[in-house]
Amino acid sequence: MAHRLIYQVVVTGTQVFAKAFTQAYKQAATAQAASKTSKSAASKFGGLQLDEACKILDVDETALDKVVAELNKKHKLEDIAESESVLAQIDKKFTHLYTVNSEHKSGSFYLQSKVYRAMERIRGELELDPLPKPEIEEPKKKEEEKK
């Protein structure tokens, strides 16, 4: 009788351990697959994650997700108008940060590159056209001012 009880305890313990092990393995496999896809997307867009790009351009990530959803639906006109206003705000922030950090205004090329890559990442997420570099007014040279 005692050997039957010990046998049941061992079998039940083995079953519980096996189920826990398989669940942990499945979770680890899905987490690894998800990290590979996010890393490949980040490497495609200059090494930036989407949340990092949103922080650089000071964009609310939930608003960006809403824009992505609306661009995928394209049903209601007011939603499209709202999405376009969010895109216009993002573009305005980009052009401001890009021009402020230009080398002609004693800005940082590194920061300018970060801003450009952040916008490139957001446009890639929204599947928009490639990003053209904004034109920056070059300061007049001293020779031209003397004339």
UniProtKB/Swiss-Prot annotation:
Residues 128-147 are annotated as: Disordered. It comes from the Eukaryota. The keyword Mitochondrion applies. It is a peripheral membrane protein. GO terms for molecular function: protein domain specific binding. Its main location: mitochondrion. GO terms for biological process: protein import into mitochondrial matrix. It is found in: Mitochondrion inner membrane. Keywords: Membrane, Mitochondrion, Mitochondrion inner membrane, Protein transport, Translocation, Transport. Residues 52-127 are annotated as: J-like. One of its GO terms (cellular component) is PAM complex, Tim23 associated import motor. InterPro entries: J_dom_sf, Tim16. Belongs to the TIM16/PAM16 family. Essential component of the PAM complex, a complex required for the translocation of transit peptide-containing proteins from the inner membrane into the mitochondrial matrix in an ATP-dependent manner. In the complex, it is required to regulate activity of mtHSP70 (SSC1) via its interaction with PAM18/TIM14. May act by positioning PAM18/TIM14 in juxtaposition to mtHSP70 at the translocon to maximize ATPase stimulation. Heterodimer with PAM18. Component of the PAM complex, at least composed of mtHsp70, MGE1, TIM44, PAM16, PAM17 and PAM18. The J-like region, although related to the J domain does not stimulate ATPase activity of mtHSP70. It nevertheless mediates the heterodimerization with the J domain of PAM18 and is therefore essential for PAM complex function. This is Mitochondrial import inner membrane translocase subunit TIM16. The gene is PAM16.
